[in-house]
Design a protein with these regions (language model features):
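A short glycine-centered beta->alpha linker in the GHKL/HATPase_c
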Residues: 86-91
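Short adenine-binding "F-helix/F-box" segment of the Bergerat
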Residues: 92-93, 100
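Conserved short strand/loop->alpha-helix "switch" segment adjacent to the catalytic nucleotide/phosphoryl-transfer site
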Residues: 31-50
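Surface-exposed acidic, glycine/proline-enriched linker/cap segments
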Residues: 103-105, 109-115, 301, 476-491
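GHKL-family ATPase ATP-binding module
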Residues: 1-19, 26, 50, 58-60, ...
Length: 652
């Protein structure tokens, strides 16, 4: 290499205070935390961890880090340790203090804004570790760099000690320990292991070759060891698709179609496989962010998939006898795919700022997909034939489903008063206050009708068993009486101007859709069937925050005239101990065991009830869990139930 070449390489790889760029100050974070981390509930609490982990992932993407350790400490503080270069600690000329202090106290300060340090960087809000610092009562940064160990502590964003050298070392890396501020995270400061595990697993698939470790010092396994997991993927998205497909139907192609290339300066990675299920399972990412609302990368993927497969199908003569057109939806039925792109300056838009807007990315993904998929189809004629046959089946089923759906939707529109007979509607026509309870069984439905506030609460009893959407073709759905009644009661239809499969919410009649089933486990199966239906066919209701689960109490604790309701066994034990001797405990096995006044007070009264909002924080994981719980494969379902049995209210 020439002297000039060496100098350029040296400049690129040097990472010091001069690389740290500052965009704005920290003052506003504690005043308006939701603006910076999304919310101040459970989601925002876990987002703090992601912000710190994203810094380490950026180091890994730049080729400087291979191991990231996340520890939940006994006091619910978090420690994130990596073996990257270590945050610079030298003096920052412009800011007049240590670069470490700049990174930890100035919002949007960091190497990710200096293109010589990082080509791309992850993280949706991208506010960095300074935001975590502002929202923590304690933050300790320990840097191993240049043979020394540097340490500095903070509280609520302000330093409580200078940058100190506390020892020597022969390794390198950054360790951040922080404790979230309970005065800001008032709902909870307790971290959920599964939420962090799901995100770290996802990051391992999206960034092959990185070791991610999770350790929970709050709980031990049967051997007395701390509970923990190690996430590592050698093949990245290929293994991600295998993981997602493990609980779905039988694969119809022999191998996973995999693309890893760069087009127009945009790295594009895609893995996809077809199976014999009936739902589309496509997940897209930009710089490790799950783009729930899609965007230009997904548009490019879908366009190339449809065009390339359609051309192959037409050229092979397999569509000759088909009497109706096939469309893009048909090419995606039974498809599991992950699309991941890295974009230097992503533009996010949409309701949740998770929709990619960069136009150049669409063309890059389209080109990458078209080229690779054409080669694959030519080289694997057996797989190509199986895919086209699947597409023809999907088109035939869609045609039948459209006819059945139109019959249902036309009947509702023409008959005018086409509401189901068993719906006890509310008197208010103000959608913003109206709510509907879907109640299992006639007896509970009767009690709910008596207990409700007729002004704004509607009751819809569900008599028969709801169809398991996971195993059924769409035309079967439109033949199911309970599902037809649910569509009619809600007032929604399928099909918008932009998307024939999207849910049209214009005529939605209720703001809150509440699933109300008995508290014991057999009946929660009905709730799961309903959630599967909403997730697969009415996902927009969940995404727009309309779906809730009612939480009836499990116990009534009585002593004389005193009555207390309990929602958990822990609560029951505490109240029983508090009341002393002579306590009578009643366990509710069903909603029908409560009278209408009790049901109103505990489960339906907006002032006293507990409603659980259904959200999709991790779409890929939600997809996998629904496929597992409602699909045909028994072993993974049994394993999942055994692992999560302690969360269930099992009546033994």
């Amino acid at each position: 290499m020439s002297t000039e070449g060496k100098e350029i390489k040296k400049q690129e790889e040097e990472y010091s205070a001069s690389n740290i760029q500052v965009l704005e100050g920290l003052e506003a974070v504690r005043k308006r935390p939701a603006m910076y981390i999304g919310d101040i509930g459970e989601k925002g609490l876990h987002h703090l961890v992601y912000e710190v982990v994203d810094n380490s992932i950026d180091e890994a993407l730049a080729g400087h880090c291979t191991d990231i350790d996340v520890t939940i400490n006994e006091d619910n503080s978090i420690t994130v340790k990596d073996n990257g270069r270590g945050i610079p600690t030298d003096f920052h000329e412009k800011e007049g203090k240590s670069a470490l202090e700049v990174v930890l106290t100035v919002l949007h300060a960091g190497g990710k804004f200096d293109k010589g340090s990082y080509k791309v960087s992850g993280g949706l809000h991208g506010v960095g570790v300074s935001c975590v610092n502002a929202l923590s009562t304690l933050l300790i940064a320990e840097i191993h760099r240049d043979g020394k160990i540097f340490r500095q502590s903070y509280s609520k964003g302000a330093p409580t000690s200078p940058v100190e050298v506390i020892g020597t070392c022969d390794d390198r890396g950054t360790t951040i320990t922080f404790k979230p501020d309970g005065s800001i995270f008032t709902l909870t400061t307790e971290y959920k292991y599964d939420i962090l595990a799901n995100r770290l697993r996802e990051l391992a698939f999206l960034n092959k070759g990185i070791h991610l470790n999770l350790l929970d010092k709050r709980q031990r396994d049967e051997n007395g060891e701390y509970v923990g997991d190690h996430f590592y993927s050698e093949e990245g998205l290929k293994e991600f698709v295998e993981y997602l497909d493990a609980t779905r139907g039988q694969a119809i192609t022999e191998s996973i179609i995999y693309i890893d290339t760069e087009k127009n300066g945009v790295p594009v990675e895609v893995a996809m496989q077809y199976n014999d299920s009936f739902s589309e399972n496509v997940h897209s990412y930009v710089n490790n962010i799950n783009t729930i609302e899609g965007g230009t990368h997904l548009t490019g993927f879908r366009r190339a998939l449809t065009r390339t497969l359609k051309k192959y199908a037409e050229d092979s003569g397999m569509l000759a006898k088909l009497k109706f057109d096939i469309n893009g939806d048909d090419f995606r039925e039974g498809l599991t795919a992950v699309v991941s792109v890295k974009v230097a300056e992503p533009q996010f838009e949409g309701q949740t700022k998770t929709k990619l807007g960069n136009d150049e990315v669409s063309a890059a993904v389209d080109q990458a997909m078209s080229t690779a998929l054409s080669h694959y189809l030519e080289e694997n004629p057996r797989d190509a034939k199986a895919i086209v046959q699947k597409v023809i089946l999907a088109a035939t089923a869609r045609h039948a489903a459209r006819h059945a759906r139109e019959m249902v939707q036309r009947k509702t529109v023409l008959s005018g008063a086409g509401l189901p007979g068993k719906l006890a509607d509310c008197s208010s026509r103000d959608r913003s206050i109206a709510e509907i309870f879907f109640v299992e069984g006639d007896s509970a439905g009767g009690t709910a009708k008596q207990g409700r506030d007729r002004n704004f609460q509607a009751i819809m009893p569900l008599r028969g068993k709801i169809l398991n959407i996971e195993k059924a073709q769409e035309h079967r759905m439109w033949e199911n009486e309970e599902i037809k009644n649910m569509f009619t009661a809600l007032g929604v239809t399928i099909g918008t101007e932009e998307d024939s499969k999207a849910l049209n919410l214009e005529k939605l009649r209720y703001d809150k859709i509440i699933i109300m089933t008995d508290a014991y486990v057999d009946v929660s199966h009905i709730a799961t069937l309903m959630l599967t239906f909403f997730f697969r066919k009415m996902k927009e209701l969940i995404e727009n925050g309309h779906v809730y689960i009612a939480t009836p109490p499990l116990f009534l604790v009585k002593k004389g005239q005193q009555e207390r309701y309990c929602w958990t066994e822990k609560e029951r034990d505490e109240i029983t101990a508090e009341m002393g001797k002579g306590v009578h405990v009643q366990r509710y096995k069903g909603l029908g065991e409560m009278n209408s006044h009790q049901l109103w007070e505990t489960t339906m009264n907006p002032d006293t009830r507990i409603l659980r909002k259904v959200t999709i924080d991790n779409a890929a994981e939600a997809d996998r869990v629904f496929s597992m719980l409602m699909g045909d494969e028994v072993p993974p379902r049994r394993e999942f139930i055994e692992k999560h049995a302690h969360y269930a209210n099992i009546d033994a």
